[in-house]
């Protein structure tokens, strides 16, 4: 999960990278899912709260190697091969990617042993244009090499580092919340009867 702050043009909150929906995606602000409300709980929200929810999205993260024919900024044809990438998908691209990975798993195949051939379909609504991924799985099995293992280890290290960063921020935010509660309690007591507090 990531929460976008349009005013500052950055992500103000991120959750840990999790593998299962059963995991608890703690976030950098000391909460869960960057405040995203899911399921039936959405019915309890006001319109303003629902509008705020649009800034928080769940992303599917795909780590892999990219090979493609492409064009440079000045229009020259070129190509790249086996470049390590992180592909972040959400919205209309979330489901197609998930379905492709699920179909591999249901056949007993591992993602790292197959090429995923990507194209996109252009969509337009009014002035808004976006692209939806179209994924075709190459049924040919690709050999998993020592170099691939090194790249996978690199991805694992990146995930571990990111999750540690978010976890540290989560605990720090919760420690601050606890300190703020204690401070608020002391202030409340002072407001109730300062003479009693100062005499003790």
Q: What do the predicted segments below correspond to?
A:
Residues 1-79, 125, 176, 181-183, ...:
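OB-fold ssDNA-binding interfaces and closely related basic DNA-contact patches used
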């Amino acid at each position: 999960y990531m929460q976008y702050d349009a005013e500052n043009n950055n992500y103000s909150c991120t959750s840990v990278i999790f593998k299962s929906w059963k995991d608890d995606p703690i976030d950098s602000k000391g909460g869960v899912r960057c405040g995203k409300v899911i399921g039936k709980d959405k019915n309890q929200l006001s319109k303003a709260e629902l509008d705020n929810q649009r800034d928080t999205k769940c992303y599917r993260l795909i780590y892999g190697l990219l090979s493609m024919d492409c064009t440079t900024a000045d229009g020259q044809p070129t190509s790249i091969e086996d470049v390590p990438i992180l592909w972040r998908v959400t919205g209309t691209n979330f489901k197609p990617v998930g379905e492709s990975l699920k179909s591999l798993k249901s056949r007993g195949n591992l993602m790292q042993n197959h090429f995923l051939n990507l194209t996109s379909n252009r969509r337009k609504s009014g002035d808004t244009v976006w692209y939806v991924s179209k994924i075709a799985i190459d049924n040919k099995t690709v050999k998993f090499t020592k170099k691939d293992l090194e790249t996978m280890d690199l991805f694992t290290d990146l995930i571990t580092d990111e999750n540690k960063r978010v976890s540290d921020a989560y605990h720090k935010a919760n420690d601050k919340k606890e300190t703020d509660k204690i401070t608020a309690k002391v202030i409340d007591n002072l407001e109730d009867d300062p003479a009693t507090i100062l005499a003790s």
